[in-house]
């Protein structure tokens, strides 16, 4: 199976702070891998380096075998990401938002892509509304459409369902499940949501203090640690003071 994403001995330091410490993992084509860890453990920094937005102190990120630092422009055209911390331009309509982002990525079949995503994400009736008037759930679906406008082969998700109501969160998770199967993309999902991780991810990376402290399928991790569920495994690992330090 092709390794669409390969992170090799990746580290990031800020003066005396080690934000990410020598992490290594792979994500195959048609696979969603979960990145689970407490606030401040290095998840967002890791995603920033994978996107080429942050320069690693050491290590490499390979996308389809190519180094992101050396091939940033060409690789970013086939990558995208979602974060709840990035706001949409409030005065643009949904359609205008998608057109702007589509042109940034030089999408050739832009109108067809907008039609496809607006149908899949239930945005058809919202295309001519300004985003400043949308609910948080509607904005989330627009952000998802924006992240998929360039038909990426690699998708990085940072808390994609944060602050969503249960119904909208379930819709987004179902969409991601189906989209991954249809497009055979590689996905890294950073989340605090255990149900989301268990439902979407074939394997999980447990992160603490900038390091990957354990990894495996949810069932493997539960069995290995003799716990009832993934949440208990997670709490055991992040509360450990000495075992992994």
Question: What residue ranges belong to the model's regions?
Answer:
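Conserved ABC ATPase "signature" region
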Residues: 99, 103-126
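Catalytic Walker B motif of ABC-type/P-loop ATPase nucleotide-binding domains
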Residues: 155-158
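ABC ATPase "signature
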Residues: 215-216
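Helical segment within the ABC ATPase nucleotide-binding domain
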Residues: 170-182
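Conserved catalytic motifs of ABC-family nucleotide-binding domains
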Residues: 151
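Conserved ABC ATPase signature
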Residues: 130-134
């Amino acid at each position: 199976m092709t390794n669409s994403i390969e992170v090799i001995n990746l580290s990031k330091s800020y003066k005396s702070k080690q934000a990410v410490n020598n992490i290594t993992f792979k994500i195959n084509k048609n696979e969603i891998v979960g990145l689970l860890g407490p606030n401040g453990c290095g998840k967002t920094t890791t995603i920033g380096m994978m996107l080429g937005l942050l320069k690693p102190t050491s290590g490499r990120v390979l996308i389809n075998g190519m180094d992101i630092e050396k091939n940033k422009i060409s690789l970013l055209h086939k990558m995208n990401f979602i974060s709840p911390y990035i706001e949409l331009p409030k005065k643009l309509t949904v359609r205008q938002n998608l057109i702007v982002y589509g042109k940034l990525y030089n999408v050739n079949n832009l109108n067809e892509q907008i039609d496809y995503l607006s149908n899949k994400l239930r945005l058809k009736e919202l295309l001519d509304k300004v985003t400043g008037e949308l609910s948080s759930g509607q904005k989330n679906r627009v952000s998802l459409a924006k992240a998929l406008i360039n038909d990426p082969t690699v998708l990085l998700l940072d808390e994609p369902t944060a602050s969503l109501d249960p119904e909208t969160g379930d819709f987004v998770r179902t969409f991601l499940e189906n989209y991954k199967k249809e497009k055979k993309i590689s996905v890294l999902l950073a989340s605090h949501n255990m149900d989301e991780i268990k439902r979407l991810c074939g394997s999980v990376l447990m992160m603490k203090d900038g390091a990957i402290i354990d990894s495996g399928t949810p069932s493997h991790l539960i069995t290995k640690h003799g716990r009832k569920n993934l949440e208990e495994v997670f709490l055991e690992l992040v509360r450990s003071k000495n075992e992994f330090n």
